[in-house]
Amino acid sequence: FIVFKSHPWERQKNNVRSALTLDKINEHIKSLSLDKSSRVLLTEHFNLEGLIKQSDYIVTLCSQSAIEAAFWGMKPIQLGNAFYGQKGFTHDYDSIDEFYADLQKNKLNKYLTVDEYDNLECFLVKFLEKSLISVHKSGILSLEKKLKLPSYIS
């Protein structure tokens, strides 16, 4: 059974005014046989934590939900080139065929190992260190450098 949860913000985009991804996937599912389409559930509003805890696998396209799944101990499957990919706590695929082959061969671990969870923690610490700005003078200097502000503005 496959559950697809669309991004909750997509319907609110000003330039689209519809849940474009959800609509396109729904169109595709309608073209499938009843045998296949009956095994797919599309949703916009479902508690992500509940969905993660009920799932055998979490497959994402550069979604924050993969990081949330990892917090819950799941080893997310990341398709594409997410900023958190290749950091030691995700299954990473550029090819659907490779992903499907590994899925069929039962090569995908559902849960993170202790070392993989450590990799998640290290990634998050480094990510936050580089993304957050200190309230001290060093943080102001960092902002000036990042934003290329003249020092007299700060």
Question: What do the predicted segments below correspond to?
Answer:
Residues F89-S154:
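Leloir-type glycosyltransferase catalytic cores
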Residues R17-T21, P76, D92-D94:
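Short secondary-structure boundary/capping segments
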Residues E44-H91:
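A donor-sugar binding/catalytic signature common to diverse glycosyltransferases
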Residues F1-H7, S37-E44, P76-N81, D94-F99, ...:
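Low-complexity, flexible helical/coil segments
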Residues F1-E44:
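Catalytic donor nucleotide-activated moiety binding site of glycosyltransferases and closely related
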